[in-house]
From Swiss-Prot:
GO cellular component, one term: cytoplasm
Annotated oxaloacetate binding sites: 99, 132, 163, 188, 243
Keyword Oxidoreductase: yes
Description of how the protein assembles with itself and partners: Homodimer.
Active site: 188
Origin: domain of life: Eukaryota
Positions contributing to NAD(+) binding: 16-17, 43, 90, 113, 132
Catalytic activity: (S)-malate + NAD(+) = oxaloacetate + NADH + H(+)
Gene3D superfamilies xref list: Lactate dehydrogenase/glycoside hydrolase, family 4, C-terminal, NAD(P)-binding Rossmann-like Domain
InterPro entries linked to this entry: L-lactate/malate_DH, Lactate/malate_DH_C, Lactate/malate_DH_N, Lactate_DH/Glyco_Ohase_4_C, Malate_DH_AS, Malate_DH_NAD-dep_euk, Malate_DH_type2, NAD(P)-bd_dom_sf
Protein name: Malate dehydrogenase
Amino acid sequence: MAKDPVRVLVTGAAGQIGYALVPMIARGVMLGADQPVILHMLDIPPAAEALNGVKMELVDAAFPLLKGVVATTDAVEACTGVNVAVMVGGFPRKEGMERKDVMSKNVSIYKSQASALEKHAAPNCKVLVVANPANTNALILKEYAPSIPEKNISCLTRLDHNRALGQISERLNVQVSDVKNVIIWGNHSSSQYPDVNHATVATPAGEKPVRELVADDAWLNGEFISTVQQRGAAIIKARKLSSALSAASSACDHIRDWVLGTPEGTWVSMGVYSDGSYNVPAGLIYSFPVACKNGEWSIVQGLPIDEFSRKKLDATAEELSEEKALAYSCLT
C-alpha cells in the first residue's frame, strides 16, 4: 500500500544548500525510495522570486515521489503540518562582523521560527538545524519551543562525521563504506574533536581498528584532526562558496538514519541535547555518537575516553558554554 506523504520543511530554501537539498529530498534520498513527500520551502521576502524559481524547477523535474510543493515567505504557512524540519536559513557572518552581532541576528531568527514550529508543526516533528552556529541555534530553538520534545531537536555534525570517514578512506585507500564508527564530539566549529579511537575498517580479514591500520598516531592526532576541523574553510577557499552539496547530502544521511535507524553495530554523530553523558555539561546541544532505532536516537554509552580525548571533549564543551552565554545575553 502506498505510504502517506511526509511533509518536509526546508528553510533558507532559495540558498545554495537549499538548492542542493530539495532535489535530494524529492528523489527519496532522505526518507527512502518508497516514501512520498510534500516539500515546504521557506525563505525571506527578498528571496521570494528565487524561491519561486526553485519551485518551478521542482515541477519541471517531475519527481514521482514529490506530491506537492509549498513555497512561501510566511513562517506559519511553511511550518503547518510538517513532520521533518531542516533549518538551513540563518544569518551568515560577514567580514568585519563581531560574533555577538551574528549571534544576535540568529537568536532572533531561531526564536521566531521556534514559535512557528511549536504552534503549527505536526506533533512529533523532527528538527535538524544546519545554519551556523548550528548547536547554539538548535539550543535557542529548543528554549523557545518548549512543547517540542528535546529529543526531537538536533543539529548537523554528520557533515564533519562524513568528512572524517572520507579522510580515513583516502589515507588507507579503502572504500568509504568500509569505514565506520568515527565520532565527532562537541561543537560544529573548529573546536570539534574528530575521534578515531573506536573506528574500524572492514577488511578481508575482518574488522580492524583504524589506528592499527593507519599506524601513524602523529597524523591521526594532528593533521587528520585539523583537516576535518578546517575542511569547511578549505572548501570556501577553493570554491569561493561554502560547501553545499556535501552539507545537503549529510543532512539527508542524518534524517534518514534518525527515521529509519542505523545498522546494527554502527553509530553516527548527531548534535543532541546533553544529559551529562561522558561528563559533558547537561543543557548543551553537543555532538555525540548515537545509534538510532524506531525513530529515536540514543547516545552510545561506555566508550573509554583517554586523556588526550578528554581534553578535547572539555575544550569544545567550554566553547559551547561560552556560545550559550553569548546567545542568552542577546535575549535580554
